[in-house]
Amino acid sequence: MAAPVKGNRKQSTEGDALDPPASPKPAGKQNGIQNPISLEDSPEAGGEREEEQEREEEQAFLVSLYKFMKERHTPIERVPHLGFKQINLWKIYKAVEKLGAYELVTGRRLWKNVYDELGGSPGSTSAATCTRRHYERLVLPYVRHLKGEDDKPLPTSKPRKQYKMAKENRGDDGATERPKKAKEERRMDQMMPGKTKADAADPAPLPSQEPPRNSTEQQGLASGSSVSFVGASGCPEAYKRLLSSFYCKGTHGIMSPLAKKKLLAQVSKVEALQCQEEGCRHGAEPQASPAVHLPESPQSPKGLTENSRHRLTPQEGLQAPGGSLREEAQAGPCPAAPIFKGCFYTHPTEVLKPVSQHPRDFFSRLKDGVLLGPPGKEGLSVKEPQLVWGGDANRPSAFHKGGSRKGILYPKPKACWVSPMAKVPAESPTLPPTFPSSPGLGSKRSLEEEGAAHSGKRLRAVSPFLKEADAKKCGAKPAGSGLVSCLLGPALGPVPPEAYRGTMLHCPLNFTGTPGPLKGQAALPFSPLVIPAFPAHFLATAGPSPMAAGLMHFPPTSFDSALRHRLCPASSAWHAPPVTTYAAPHFFHLNTKL
């Protein structure tokens, strides 16, 4: 019992020795009683102290910052606004330091977080970029100065990739563009020779082989769709080059709209110039007759685009006489012959329909310029001179009964609708039933005398027509020159070459029928480019008669006079005695559309 007591005493004595350090306990109790009063006052006092310290730090920071930037010769004259609030340089400095300094914030793309801490509007789209740029310009140099770092150049920000072409511009422009141009040229050279060889091989198959009808129809459609000056051998290649060079996806990649427009304009301009040069080169070749030459005019492309070309449907193509497509395909590539294409303009009070379908348009070969027929079974010479608008007066034609042409080589065209015309008296003169195959000058003069009686009247331009004839009346024997005569019209006299010097064909301004123009007689209300049409009384008397593929049964000599008036300049007079009836229809109306 004594031992524990001694132990307790020892502990008590030790406790007494240790009591002075533990003496604050009662004071602690007293503090515990007094703490509520001090705790109530401490947050305000501590908050005020912290605010005072922050203000002092902020003030010292701003003073040193402004001083440093002034010494650096980049003074801060005006603090910019960000998010409809003026930037607090102290807050932006503390926010960046809190997120891990400039490099870390830039690497992790945390500038939007810095902007949010500054209290900017949340709808700003350029918040991060603007915050970073303001910090780099106003605060970063001083922060690096405080840390003892050198003023390093700012890290380059990654540019926004607008288009893929930006990668090419980083390197040497010449080194990257030259190989690309060379590759494009090689690719075009590889593509174009194959196409040209295929195009050249298609129109000239072996005589023993029959080309499929589908290929001929496709060639016809392709040649009709491509706008060409002299035929299918001119500009379609240029347009293929244009399309293939521009729409090649691997060439340019994703391009801006402005770059696309510039490239398309350059390519189309170059191709148009090449197309015109090829057209002029082909038109100047001596293959065509010097008398008939396609006039180059600025109106010709417009006329070509406005000219709607129709093709035979597959059913109509199958109804063609047997062997006609074969013989045309066997004819091989022939020189492109000039075909009169243009846009006729009339007086505002007159009506003239645009040019459209003609029997020669039923075949792409004929439209492309193959006017010579194949050698017939009767042993006709292949080297027959190429015919232009027609033959001579002595050559028999398919337009009259006395002709020796017994067959046709193209299918029968459909009849066109004729617009209502002026009323015709019942006692209008009628055409003679038959005509000699080779009429002389006397018959020509008599027809001209008959044709100019009603020339004093104003001729209204009426819609031309095509009448359908029974093909059974014509023989089934094909002949090469017969096709040309059927297509191009009957005998036509020599045409003066001066008629083609203008940009358009002219017509006489008056049809008086006297050796010189009468001074007292008023001229017809036609402009120099107007082509007169059929008179109404002549249209009424022209009945159906045996003819080739629906072409009208007209006297061959009347075409001579009609074409002469079409092709001669407006100043030339009509040297013919006065006549009674006008019976000279114009052949070009067969090529018009209602």
Curated annotation (Swiss-Prot):
Q: Where can the Glycyl lysine isopeptide (Lys-Gly) (interchain with G-Cter in ubiquitin) cross-link be found?
A: K85, K94
SMART domains tied to this protein: ARID (SM01014), BRIGHT (SM00501)
According to its UniProt entry, this protein's organism is: Homo sapiens
Signal peptide extent: none
From the UniProt entry, list the residue stretches annotated as the region Interaction with SOX9. 1-300
Report the function annotation for this chain.
DNA-binding protein that may regulate transcription and act as a repressor by binding to AT-rich stretches in the promoter region of target genes. May positively regulate chondrocyte-specific transcription such as of COL2A1 in collaboration with SOX9 and positively regulate histone H3 acetylation at chondrocyte-specific genes. May stimulate early-stage chondrocyte differentiation and inhibit later stage differention. Can repress ESR1-mediated transcriptional activation; proposed to act as corepressor for selective nuclear hormone receptors.
Write out the ranges of the annotated region (Disordered).
1-56, 146-223, 281-331, 426-454
Identify the keywords attached in UniProt to this record, alphabetized. Activator, DNA-binding, Immunity, Innate immunity, Isopeptide bond, Nucleus, Phosphoprotein, Repressor, RNA-binding, Transcription, Transcription regulation, Ubl conjugation
Concerning PTM, the database record says: Phosphorylated by MAPK14 on serine residues involving a TLR4 signaling pathway upon lipopolysaccharide (LPS) stimulation leading to its ubiquitination and proteasomal degradation.
Looking at the record's lineage, which domain of life comes first? Eukaryota
The gene name reads ARID5A
Question: Which biological process annotations from GO are given for this protein?
Answer: cellular response to estrogen stimulus; cellular response to lipopolysaccharide; chondrocyte differentiation; innate immune response; negative regulation of DNA-templated transcription; negative regulation of transcription by RNA polymerase II; positive regulation of 3'-UTR-mediated mRNA stabilization; positive regulation of interleukin-17 production
Name of the protein in question: AT-rich interactive domain-containing protein 5A
Question: Residue ranges of the ARID domain?
Answer: 55-147
**Compartments, record wording:** Nucleus
Query: Basic and acidic residues composition bias: which ranges?
Result: 165-189
Biased region (Polar residues) positions are 297-306
Report the Gene3D superfamilies cross-referenced here: ARID DNA-binding domain
Residue numbers of Phosphoserine PTMs:
S23, S256, S289, S438, S463
Q: How would you summarize the oligomeric state and partners of this protein?
A: Interacts with SOX9. Interacts with ESR1. Interacts with RORC.
